[in-house]
């Protein structure tokens, strides 16, 4: 019985291909973005379909006040019985950046990073959210001004964004 022994060339090719496969798998797992000092995920701005443009705040000054915060109130679907929706707070910054907060600690380092852009007179917000079931997924909201009320529309929900004036230092800039 004759056995074929691998040649050094075939071993070299096998190691080369296995190395390429391993590096591809590892790089896809670790190149998802970076984290800031507060443990918040920071994505590359190139992953967003909207663009954080310089001077974007000039286009929204009649709609959004950069010195206020906006509290999200879910209008539709109606709240389920004995279920409380998490309320989020939006803070708009200059140059097309928006922070989404789960409480009134408005430190930009603790915010979920988001981008806003004005298109055809409507304000669009985009951010990445995390859930245990889905991992990171993209959320897009269109905001339209109806009289003095801001309404946000996503794929699943309709929101009202209630303006709240707060006192404080608004000089903090986001880290994205």
Give the residues covered by each predicted segment.
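Bacterial Sec-dependent N-terminal signal peptides
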Residues: 1-39
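Lipid interaction determinants
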Residues: 29-112, 119, 124-176
């Amino acid at each position: 019985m004759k056995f074929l022994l691998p040649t050094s060339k075939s071993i070299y090719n096998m190691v080369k291909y296995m190395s390429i496969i391993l590096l591809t798998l590892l790089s896809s797992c670790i190149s998802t973005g970076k984290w800031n000092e507060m443990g918040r995920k920071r994505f590359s701005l190139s992953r967003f379909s909207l663009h954080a443009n310089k001077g974007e705040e000039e286009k929204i000054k009649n709609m959004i006040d950069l010195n206020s915060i906006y509290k999200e109130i879910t209008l539709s679907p109606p709240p389920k019985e004995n279920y409380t929706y998490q309320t989020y707070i939006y803070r708009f910054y200059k140059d097309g950046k928006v922070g989404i907060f789960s409480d009134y600690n408005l430190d930009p380092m603790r915010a979920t990073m988001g981008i806003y852009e004005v298109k055809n007179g409507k304000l669009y917000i985009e951010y990445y959210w995390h859930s245990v079931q889905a991992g990171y997924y993209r959320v897009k909201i269109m905001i339209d001004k109806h009289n003095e009320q801001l309404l946000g529309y996503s794929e699943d929900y309709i929101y009202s964004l209630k303006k709240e004036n707060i006192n404080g230092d608004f000089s903090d800039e986001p880290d994205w």
